[in-house]
Amino acid sequence: MKIREIVRKYDRKRENLLQILHEIQDDNPQNYISKKNIELLSEEIGIPVSDIAGTASFYTMFSFKPRGKYIIRVCASPPCHIMGAETIFEVISRELQIEKSETTVDGLFTLEETSCLGVCAVAPAAMINDTVYGHLTGEKIKKILLQIKKKEGK
């Protein structure tokens, strides 16, 4: 979808900036907001580039660099940390051969840390794209990754 079409859905209002940014990022196969996207959005909505970039950079869910098809966000909140989030990171890193903030060579996965997913009752937790997984263990996350790889023919 073109930026102009996305903006039209939201009546060019500043209060809709977050929704617009989410749609722009979701529309990009590499799951990020490019500098060109921000410049075009600025022209379309009449908000300075610096305001748009500042807003997007404040939120961890937005990225300015290309990412994988599957974005794995591991919660690092205190409850998740206490319940084993670091182990989840280690297992994912080992299985995918990437570190935090990296993308696999094939462009399939990106591993990110997020401050809180708001699902403390099921710690440790992670979100892969829009799906939340709770009560994670090393074995459980391995199975989830394997299912995704099979789905993608890897």
Model regions: which residues?
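Signature of N-terminal electron-transfer/Fe-S-associated modules in redox systems
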Residues: 1-154
